[in-house]
C-alpha cells in the first residue's frame, strides 16, 4: 500500500493535488516582498512546501503519513505569528515531528504542556486523512508527554524565564514537517525511507529551509541532533548561503547520552557557541 502526504479529511480527493492549498497559499504575500512581516513570509514558505509535499507518494515501509502543517495549521500559525514578528539571529532546527509533540500541537518539539502553559499557544486541531489506530491525533488533549519536547522547552524556560526572551533572537523549526509510520504504527524518520523517496523528500525540504533562512535573516543554524546539523550544512552550502551551522545534542530518550544530564550538556554547548548570552539577556 502506498501512503500519500495527506490534506485534511474535509478536502475532497479532487482538491488534494493543490487547488485548496494553492488558494490558501495565495492569502500570504509573496516572500520576495519587502513589506510583509517575517511571520507572513515564513508561513508562505511553509504553505508552498505543503503544496509540493502533497504530491508525494511513499512506498513500504511507510504506511501512514501525517502533516501537522495541514491538520494542526491553526496552532502552528498562532506559534509563528506570535513568535516570529522580527528577523532572527539563531534558528534551532529539528529533523521532523514526533508523534506526541508537533504531531499533536503543530509546534516544533511541541510537548503539550510546554506549548500550552509556557508558550501560551493553542488552537483547534483536526485529523490526518488516514489515522493509525495506535497513533491517534488528540491535539491538546493528548495525554502522553513527548520527552524530547519536554526536555527542549524546559531548558529554554529555565534559561530565559519568559518565551519572549528566547524568541527575541531565536526561532525553532523542523527540516521536514511530515511524520511517517509503518504498518504497526512505529515511527519512521526520513532516514528510514528508501533512498529514492528520501532524496526527493529531502531536496524539497532543503529548498524550503534555504528560503526560511533567507526570510528570517538567520546568521546561525543550530541543528538539534547530527542529522539536522549535517542536512542544514549541505543544503545551505549548495545554495551558497553564508550561514554558520553548528549542532547540539538531541534530547531524545533513545540517545543514551541524553539520559545522562542532557540539560547540563547542552548548556555547555550553547556557551561554547556563544548563544547563551542571547538567551539570558
From Swiss-Prot:
Transmembrane segments: none annotated. Its main location: nucleus. It comes from the Eukaryota. GO terms for biological process: base-excision repair. The keyword Methyltransferase does not apply. Belongs to the uracil-DNA glycosylase (UDG) superfamily. SMUG1 family. One of its GO terms (molecular function) is uracil DNA N-glycosylase activity. This is Single-strand selective monofunctional uracil DNA glycosylase. The gene is smug1. Its EC number is 3.2.2.-. GO terms for cellular component: nucleus. The keyword DNA repair applies. Recognizes base lesions in the genome and initiates base excision DNA repair. Acts as a monofunctional DNA glycosylase specific for uracil (U) residues in DNA with a preference for single-stranded DNA substrates. Does not exhibit any enzymatic activity towards G/T mismatches. InterPro entries: SMUG1 (IPR039134), Uracil-DNA_glycosylase-like (IPR005122), Uracil-DNA_glycosylase-like_sf (IPR036895). Keywords: DNA damage, DNA repair, DNA-binding, Hydrolase, Nucleus. It is an enzyme of class 3 (hydrolase). Residues 182-198 are annotated as: DNA-binding. Substrate binds at residues 95, 109, 174, 250.
